[in-house]
Amino acid sequence: MNDFGIKNMDQVAPVANSYRGTLKRQPAFDTFDGSLFAVFPSLNEEQTLQEVPTGLDSISHDSANCELPLLTPCSKAVMSQALKATFSGFKKEQRRLGIPKNPWLWSEQQVCQWLLWATNEFSLVNVNLQRFGMNGQMLCNLGKERFLELAPDFVGDILWEHLEQMIKENQEKTEDQYEENSHLTSVPHWINSNTLGFGTEQAPYGMQTQNYPKGGLLDSMCPASTPSVLSSEQEFQMFPKSRLSSVSVTYCSVSQDFPGSNLNLLTNNSGTPKDHDSPENGADSFESSDSLLQSWNSQSSLLDVQRVPSFESFEDDCSQSLCLNKPTMSFKDYIQERSDPVEQGKPVIPAAVLAGFTGSGPIQLWQFLLELLSDKSCQSFISWTGDGWEFKLADPDEVARRWGKRKNKPKMNYEKLSRGLRYYYDKNIIHKTSGKRYVYRFVCDLQNLLGFTPEELHAILGVQPDTED
């Protein structure tokens, strides 16, 4: 046994004594002598060559305390499990910012919000967000190779994996909903088993079946339980001969921002199809549809306003697009039909009722402002000026405080509130009155929506024209 406690010298390379260690024997070393290592600094007896590294010494001793399982290059399942645990943090961000679960429906801003989350999650630096100036459809259509060219180094594969995972989860959810709602009990009441078939069975009357892409627009926009809408997942097969001459399938115009085809088929009790309006994707698309707005001002539609997006999101709820029907009555008629008269001292236009009437989901900022403006007790801090639909924030901080309280946002202030108001400018919902501080005007067709003229509403509230310049 030598100084290093090695019994069998055949296990080490024949190098100079001062460099002997536990290295395995390699034939190449047999041809060299100790002069080969003369260029290296001298080593003390205690600082001998280290053992051949196994990689185990690089593992942290506290790895057992990690939340994620230990990754190994050969374990794809473990890697996938770890990535899913990391990606789950984005779901909370989606709820906070109102980002749709389906990446195909993302706006350009929501793509940016996803990348900002990844930048923070993976501590990325020098990320050029301008390279991803595209909406969700364009992002999903890039393909992996093109995506990796645009993505930051070293994390492109991870981001692509996350994107694929979200798309897959959305498709699986869509397929599950289709399975649950493809029974005959979920179709319109005028259809029975003798008139409509689903699946891949051959149509006996020769009507050609047409398949529609799975994970398409309708599944994320219209509730699957809507009794009068046929899901795009369902394969329309046949009607009996007696009805073939009177039945036609109509297609709704869809913004190019969305993939796939959109089939909406509505009928009345006699079996004759009627028109159905094309839904819009919330804040992602404010383009007006003629069929949806034929009784509205052509400039805008309050039905399109799903949320006010910002990095300080006003909405907690996910703003998935809703299947909105064109209103057939005014809000005033709607209230009267509900036999729900306005109580004394209460707002004439309750925001929650207005949200239900328009089908916008969570209460929106413009609806909340109308509630305050129709409440006599709020006239000390917000009121109509008496000039049409113009209104003034006499105490903008109080308005912001109440909006924050309604949406459970304690840090809400007028700066953030005004950011939401500015978002309405381009959508022709609300405009700022030039030359007047804290004065705004509704420029959409509120009269058709509410069923009140400005003068009628002012009379109910006892509003006097504002003579202040």
Curated annotation (Swiss-Prot):
Keywords from the named record: DNA-binding, Nucleus, Phosphoprotein, Proto-oncogene, Transcription, Transcription regulation
Assigned GO CC terms: chromatin; cytosol; nucleoplasm; nucleus; plasma membrane
Positions of modified residues (Phosphoserine): 220, 225, 295, 298, 301
SMART domains (alphabetical): ETS, SAM_PNT
Stored Gene3D superfamilies: Transcription Factor, Ets-1, Winged helix-like DNA-binding domain superfamily/Winged helix DNA-binding domain
Residue numbers spanned by region Disordered: 264-289
Coiled coil: none
PROSITE patterns registered for this protein in UniProt: ETS_DOMAIN_1, ETS_DOMAIN_2, ETS_DOMAIN_3, PNT
BP term (GO), one: primitive streak formation
Chief localisation class: nucleus
Pfam families: Ets, Ets1_N_flank, SAM_PNT
Keyword Zinc: no
GO molecular function terms noted in the UniProt entry: DNA binding; DNA-binding transcription factor activity; DNA-binding transcription factor activity, RNA polymerase II-specific; DNA-binding transcription repressor activity, RNA polymerase II-specific; nuclear glucocorticoid receptor binding; protein domain specific binding; RNA polymerase II cis-regulatory region sequence-specific DNA binding; RNA polymerase II-specific DNA-binding transcription factor binding
Subcellular location: Nucleus
DNA-binding region per Swiss-Prot/TrEMBL record: 363-443
Residues in PNT domain copies: 85-170
PTM comment: Phosphorylation by CDK10 at Ser-220 and Ser-225 creates a phosphodegron that targets ETS2 for proteasomal degradation.
Annotated family: Belongs to the ETS family.
Role, per record: Transcription factor activating transcription. Binds specifically the DNA GGAA/T core motif (Ets-binding site or EBS) in gene promoters and stimulates transcription.
Protein name as it appears in the record: Protein C-ets-2
Organism: Homo sapiens (Human)
Gene, per the UniProt record: ETS2
